[in-house]
Amino acid sequence: MLWFQGKSLQIAKSSFGLLRNLSASNRALPVLTLFTKAPCPLCDEAKEVLQPYKDRFILQEVDITLPENSTWYERYKFDIPVFHLNGQFLMMHRVNTSKLEKQLRKLEQQVLATN
């Protein structure tokens, strides 16, 4: 009986470590911010192009027409969709998949190097 409890505790500790690693890996995902508004056919097209990459970043959409986003509206009102990766400008108008791939790979390598 004691052996079983010890194994259960060991399994629980292993599971906790796995969950901690999973949550750490989620934190390591870069944030791709999409500055958008409705309607925006180019934004819809961009989201389709991004589908194959969806497990490699967290997509955050910012509606530039909302009052709290007026700064972004003034900056990007004629240029949406605009993309930032981890807060840095990446591209606008259309998804450049080679640029996106290059930047994602670079960030993924940085994460691997720190682990």
From Swiss-Prot:
Q: Would I find Transcription regulation among this entry's keywords?
A: no
Q: Which domain of life is it from?
A: Eukaryota
Q: Which GO terms describe its cellular component?
A: mitochondrion
> Which InterPro entries has this protein been placed in?
Glutaredoxin-like, Glutaredoxin-like_YDR286C, Thioredoxin-like_sf
Q: Which cysteines are joined by disulfide bonds?
A: C40-C43
What keywords is this UniProt entry annotated with?
Disulfide bond, Electron transport, Transport
Q: Does the keyword Disulfide bond apply?
A: yes
Report the family membership.
Belongs to the glutaredoxin family. YDR286C subfamily.
Q: What protein name applies here? A: Glutaredoxin-like protein C5orf63 homolog
Q: Which organism is it from?
A: Mus musculus (Mouse)
